[in-house]
């Protein structure tokens, strides 16, 4: 475990989590719960958005109807920053997810100290004992944990670790190829007590409507929004399109 400073602990203690999972479930009851992702770059696409202003993006996405925000903080592969997380949280009332490769509990304390309300744990990147330990640390800090799985084995591990917010990622981490059908294959394996989140490959309101019909409650969308000239407008159109399809 890395060194935990008193100042970091105090900053974490000062942040009162906003309830990431609760927000998703509340919005999903009557609407379309989108987790809008602030992502400057990615390993597969390179630079996605040169004009990357977290505060402005967060405000626009909240006004457009996002249920929550996801903020990339990994510097090496996504050109992210904890500063982006803090700025997004300060500029919006929405709960924020720290999206990073979290492997040590100090990163959880860092997340809360920088105003995160939830963290991402990638099942494929962790041994089971690590997954269980990090989940417990985050929950003890009052943070929600989005456990990301790519197949049935990883899903079972996430459930065994006590995760109640499950993300199914349709992107293959080895090839970066996206197969949205992966989300449909696994959704029935997720208990109804969990909030089901579909990740990657969502391009249209029709995709959202299909996923909603299959049992998903929330949809993590980043690249298509960040590529748009006005991400807020793009999200508004996406949600409206999904509503039209759902209400047919």
PLM feature segments, named:
Residues 185-189, 212, 227-248:
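C-terminal helical cap(s) of enzyme catalytic domains, especially alpha/beta-barrels
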Residues 13-31:
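Flexible, solvent-exposed loop/hinge segments and secondary-structure transition points
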Residues 11-15, 19, 106, 115:
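Hydrophobic alpha-helical segments, chiefly the membrane-spanning helices
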Residues 110-130, 167-176, 216-235:
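Glycine-rich phosphate-binding active-site loops on the catalytic face of alpha/beta enzymes
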Residues 1-2:
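Short, small-residue-biased leader/transition segments that mark boundaries at the very start
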Residues 103-115, 150-161, 198, 202-221, ...:
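Catalytic cores of alpha/beta
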Residues 32-33, 38, 45-146, 152-157, ...:
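N-terminal active-site wall of soluble small-molecule enzyme domains
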Residues 165-221:
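Catalytic-face loop-and-helix region of soluble metabolic enzyme cores
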